[in-house]
Amino acid sequence: KQKEAWRHRKKKDQGMTTVVPALQAEGLAELSQVMLSHGDEDHVGNLKTIAKHLTIRQLIIGKGMEKIPLMQEMKKRYPKIQWRLVLAGDEWKWNETTWKVLWPKGLSQAENEDSILALVAVMKQTILLTGDASEKVEEAVAHANPNLQFSILKAGHHGSRTSSGEALLTLVQPRLAFISCGKHNHYGHPSPETLARLKATGAIIFRTDQDGQIRLRLTWEKLEVTTMLTKRKKELKQ
């Protein structure tokens, strides 16, 4: 199954070759918060490598996900890490950010449909993080939050055809959309249908398979997006 292929795939340690060097290049020795959307290998598989090389202060996961083997191992190996187990309705502030969890509603089984959907308000912008949630989850969230607003979307499930659906994009038209997907991936992400839906909203689209590393900088005056491979640069006033 496609799901199982993602969960059990064995490839080179992207944590060591990509994530850790990128974070260390920014001068980071510790991470105040790390949010894990759900339990798929391509979302949590590099956690142990990251924790080995950088200090993690707090892990944010869906309530119930703490029962999976990886989380149990992390608790034993890194007892000083704080844990925040979240469900829809949870809110908290951290520095200049405000976090609001929109999903999951019930205990997480660490599956795609249990992905954390979170709104992160930073200065004058609001970002929607979506994990691998499907249109079905998006519809439930849109129905429960008819006044939902966000300016930046992290597109769901790597730009899959079954995410970033009409229910969500009819309710909100983001200014920016980010798609995280591998170059020449076996699943054809992002799908043409999803790209068409995002383009119809007027969103400026950035995608890691083409743009490489994407950097988002926010100040009170503007937001700036730059890309490593394509050298794109986009500035928008706040």
Give the predicted meaning of each segment.
Residues K1-Q238:
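Non-globular, low-confidence helical/coil segments that flank catalytic cores
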